[in-house]
Amino acid sequence: QNIAVKLLEAIKYPNYDDVNLAPYHSSFDARNSALSRRTVQIYQELGLWSALQEHATPILEVNITEQGSFGKARLKAEQEKVESFGQVIENAWLGRVLLTEVQKQPLIELIDGVQVTQLTQDADMAYIDASRGEEQLSLQAKLVIAADGRDSFCRKALGIGASEHDYDQVAIVTTVQTSKPHNHVGFERFSSLGPLALLPLPGEYRRSVVWPVKKGTEGEWLGDENDQHFLDALQDTYGDRAGKFQKTGKRFSFPLSQVLAEKQAVGRVILMGNAANTIH
């Protein structure tokens, strides 16, 4: 049975009639996502992976070490009899491919630049009031899927409580260039400053960095004037396994916390994604 969908998005999107019309170039400041093997399988089943993999890199090996310790753990996809442990993809490309596909679907209406102002429901229907600039929208549906983030307006509008745990850390996220190729190896390095993750990216010398640090200290690592300081800290913590850390992109910081909704479904509304369960 065909189901008509209205997709409400808070941000304003560009119009991509065809993903191939405008050339895409990898950005050194691009943010990235690590996709699990199951997520990749879902995109394959949807017929989207052939486009997505153009700017994705498989993780074929994972090395885990601790600063000051000789021991290490090494996992290889080949030995585990899997194609890979997952894929790392640039968020900008992931969003572009998915948006292009959404705009091709006749049963999906994308309404962007929207702010939901009210969500109510009765036994038969859910009702949404929203604003889009000066325009006021009133919508109703038999099912609402709310995926509006860790601070979900929809969750609060429904009176659903949530337990929260603050880890007192922020994650520094960026892209770096190293003198040695990554060879599709992901690394996790435990140090006194926190666990450092290095993931392979398209381009054999580019890696994604995720480095949790104590909340309040992130200013030391952000800003263009701190580029060399950040690279030096990476070098000191990680050693020469990746060669020399030569270049860093813009650093982003994200607070680390857990938010778990007390309920994930109420009446005709389902919470999904970070609105239901945020881990880090």
Task: Place the predicted regions along the sequence by residue.
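Glycine-rich FAD cofactor-binding loop and adjacent beta-loop-alpha segment at the N-terminus
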Residues: 1-60
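Glycine-rich, N-terminal phosphate-binding loop of Rossmann-like dinucleotide-binding domains
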Residues: 15, 148-149, 279
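Short beta-strand to alpha-helix junction loop
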Residues: 34-37, 79-100, 218-226, 256-260
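Conserved N-terminal helical subregion
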Residues: 52-157, 165-170
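Short gly/ser/thr-rich secondary-structure transition/capping motifs
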Residues: 124-127, 250-259
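Central beta-strand plus flanking loop segment that forms part of the substrate or channel wall
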Residues: 151-186, 205, 215-217, 235-238
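Conserved FAD/dinucleotide-binding core of flavoprotein oxidoreductases
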Residues: 191-255
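Conserved mid-domain beta->alpha element of the FAD-binding
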Residues: 254-280
